[in-house]
């Protein structure tokens, strides 16, 4: 490593093997880094590759030749398609609602001092830190007590619930160092409170809001634990896939997951670019 | 302002107490002042305690006037400005814009614009977008919008940079965008909070001249907040010198400089010599019908000065302070004749400064007096260190101020709220004089350091 290579020369005679040892250490580090990266990426690669596997039988876990068949028959399994549509609409809706509410909550926490602010903050972090099993189970008992039938709506409510905190945390972080005198300048120049928010505050916190929305979408689309408690007979993509593991996951799942993954990566990259371009 | 009725020689006019207020609204035409503050006070609340930031301010600022609020950091200048703009609600008192009470009107519906100390430009809009912001809120669009923005950018010489974002501009350019963004709305008054504070000296001096020129051109009332006395003296028609949330003196720059009303003003504006003496006699009908105060002095020495016009009556034996500017003092080897003030002294320091030389002279009382001697003809010093000389000045070039009774030796210069709580409005006052505690502020860095006898 560089720190060893650039060690003071007076140490060199005492440790003749120092230079070579350094190179060895460096190689080990490289190897270790690649190993970790591989470990992280390998499942994804396998998932993508097996979307192109010309499967025989029920199990899709031995390579049998390349095909684009599953991409063509993407929506051939009606239940899976329904589950995917459920997942996507729930993710979009919960993201929209949670981003709106979470942004307002983040603004309140980051900009104002009010009675009970500490309590709200604690609640927000508790929501993030609490085990999903606990959240899911307690929500379920709440719904049962209130007599709300489990299904699409309860899944949506649950997703909004856990997403609000994530958005609020991200927006709040974005507000650190926010110069509120630009809002005063807008008021001074004749903008009312709402116009000021629309023309000044929102554009300035937009990168934070988008990051929060992205995070919320990603959290929602693959949520399993809380969803399974509150789904009733409704199925989402993760629930359907988990159910299918017992009988063999069809390659369509790989294709759908590949598409979700690629879209997710593109969105994240776009957001990062946006953040870099508008360093404010 | 030349209306104060006295000339450059410092010849004193009688009745000048009223002339300091000539620019406040025009009684003859009946036009209301552009801005009026009536008994305005502001307390901030921190940890359940009320902290007074502005104690009580009464002001009337005339249309088209260049008015400065001058004072040390923390004296309440920004708070006053923010109350006028509508960002702070006064705890007491009323604010009137062109005769209309706007105390409860939100900032977006007040016809004033503020140039923020930090500029507060919109980082996501370009220069033109920043300048157009206020006009767009008023529904100005299309050609008129483009023309007015273009004219304003020409005025502040930023036309070339119209498409730049604020972060791509230098400090001076950002400052001019902030100015243009406010001015383009043609407000009834423009409020400027230390607008040149972040610029370097050279740019600041250029901008002072430009600002004054722009103000003359657009004819809008300017209220200019600064802690820089040079800036205030250069640009203003009138100055309100603030200290601890009060106005200590409100007058023209010349009046403020030549007749500081309080010890604080004398110390804060320029360099002042302060001599602490006892009153020996009061001549109620001195030259020009003015009360002259004769002060204790040594043998063949003579100290007399007019009473400050706004100061109450004095009696023999009262402790007072005489103030005289360093450039009004003459030095000579022998005792000067005539009715001037004369003091003996020994030169302890000579500092050559190009256009003038500074002499520090120790009087027999022990007070050190600073003298500015213009290097107009002679290139040699008129006197050397250690020499015994006579100091003299005309009595009307000096003033007698009340001696600050309860002087605190180490008042923080910030003038922030002091932990014990500053004296509130019920402290004893004399003839409109601020409470003694307020007048007792330690002079700032610009003041000479008089040594008490
Ligand atoms: N928002 C605030 N809350 C509490 N105290 C404040 C606030 N703003 C200003 N102050 C206090 O009020 C006093 C006057 O402040 P300010 O008007 O900013 O002074 P200046 O502009 O003359 O430096 C200061 O002592 C300051 O600490
Ligand atoms: Mg200030």
Q: What residue ranges belong to the model's regions?
A:
Chain B
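ABC ATPase nucleotide-binding domains
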Residues: 107-267
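Conserved coupling/switch loops of ABC nucleotide-binding domains, chiefly the family-specific signature
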Residues: 91-94, 144, 244, 276
């Amino acid at each position: 490593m560089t720190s060893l290579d650039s060690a003071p020369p007076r140490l060199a005679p005492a440790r003749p093997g120092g230079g070579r040892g350094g190179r060895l250490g460096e190689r080990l580090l490289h190897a270790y880094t690649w190993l970790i990266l591989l470990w992280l990426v390998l499942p994804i690669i396998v998932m993508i590759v097996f979307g192109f596997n010309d499967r025989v039988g029920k199990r899709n876990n031995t390579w049998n030749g390349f095909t684009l068949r599953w991409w063509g028959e993407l929506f051939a399994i009606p239940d899976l398609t329904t589950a995917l549509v459920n997942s996507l609409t729930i993710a979009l809706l919960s993201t929209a609602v949670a981003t709106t509410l979470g942004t307002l909550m983040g603004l309140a926490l980051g900009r104002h001092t009010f009675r009970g602010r500490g309590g709200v903050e604690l609640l927000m972090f508790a929501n993030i830190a609490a085990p999903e099993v606990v959240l899911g189970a307690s929500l379920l008992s709440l719904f049962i007590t209130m007599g709300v039938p489990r299904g699409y709506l309860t899944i949506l409510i649950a997703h909004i619930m856990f997403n609000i905190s994530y958005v609020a945390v991200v927006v709040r972080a974005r507000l650190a160092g926010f110069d509120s005198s630009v809002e005063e300048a807008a008021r001074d120049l004749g903008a009312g409170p709402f116009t000021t928010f629309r023309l000044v505050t929102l554009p300035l916190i937009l990168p934070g809001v988008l990051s929060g929305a992205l995070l919320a979408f990603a959290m929602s689309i693959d949520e399993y634990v809380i969803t399974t408690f509150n789904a009733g007979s409704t199925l989402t993509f993760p629930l359907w896939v988990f159910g299918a593991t017992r009988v063999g996951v069809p390659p369509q799942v790989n294709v759908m997951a590949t598409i979700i993954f690629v879209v997710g990566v593109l969105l994240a990259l776009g957001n990062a670019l946006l953040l870099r371009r508008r360093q404010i | 302002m030349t209306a104060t009725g006295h000339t450059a020689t410092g010849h004193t006019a009688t009745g000048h107490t009223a002339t300091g207020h000539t620019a406040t609204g025009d009684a003859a035409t009946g036009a209301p002042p552009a801005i009026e503050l009536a008994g305005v006070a502001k307390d901030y609340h921190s940890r359940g305690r009320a902290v007074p930031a502005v104690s009580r301010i009464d002001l009337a600022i005339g249309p088209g006037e260049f008015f400065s609020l001058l004072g040390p950091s923390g004296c309440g200048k920004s708070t006053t400005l923010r109350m006028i703009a509508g960002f702070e609600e006064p705890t007491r008192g009323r604010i009137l814009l062109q005769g209309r009470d706007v105390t409860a009107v939100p900032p977006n519906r007040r016809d004033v614009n503020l140039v923020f100390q930090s500029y507060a430009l919109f980082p996501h809009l370009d220069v033109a977008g920043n300048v157009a912001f206020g006009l767009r809120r008023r529904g100005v669009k299309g050609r008129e919008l483009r023309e007015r923005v273009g004219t304003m950018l020409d005025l502040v010489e930023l036309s070339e940079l119209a498409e730049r974002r604020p972060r791509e501009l230098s400090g001076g350019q950002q400052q001019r965008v902030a100015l243009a963004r406010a001015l383009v709305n043609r407000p009834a008054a423009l409020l400027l909070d230390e607008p040149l504070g972040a610029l370097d000296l050279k740019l600041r001096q250029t901008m002072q001249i430009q600002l004054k020129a722009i103000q003359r051109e657009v004819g809008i009332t300017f209220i200019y907040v600064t802690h820089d006395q040079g800036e205030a003296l250069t640009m203003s028609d009138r100055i309100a010198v603030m200290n601890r949330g009060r106005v200590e003196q409100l007058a023209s720059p010349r009046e403020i400089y030549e007749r500081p009303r309080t010890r604080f003003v004398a110390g804060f504006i320029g360099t002042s010599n302060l001599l602490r003496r006892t009153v020996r006699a009061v001549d109620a009908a001195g030259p020009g019908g003015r009360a002259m105060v004769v002060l204790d002095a040594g043998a063949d020495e003579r100290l007399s000065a007019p009473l400050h016009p706004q100061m109450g009556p004095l009696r023999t034996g009262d402790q007072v302070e005489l103030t005289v500017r360093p450039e009004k003092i003459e030095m000579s080897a022998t005792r000067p004749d005539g009715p001037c003030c004369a003091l003996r002294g020994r030169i302890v320091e000579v500092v050559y400064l190009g256009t003038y030389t500074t002499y520090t002279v120790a009087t027999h009382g022990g007070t050190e007096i600073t003298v500015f001697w213009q290097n107009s003809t002679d290139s040699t010093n008129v006197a050397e260190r250690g020499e015994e000389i006579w100091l003299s000045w005309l009595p009307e070039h000096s003033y007698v101020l009340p001696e600050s009774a309860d002087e605190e030796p180490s008042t923080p210069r910030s003038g922030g709220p002091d932990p014990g709580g500053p004296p509130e409005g019920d402290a004893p006052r004399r003839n409109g004089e601020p409470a003694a505690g307020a007048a007792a502020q330690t002079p700032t860095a610009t003041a000479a350091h008089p040594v008490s006898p």
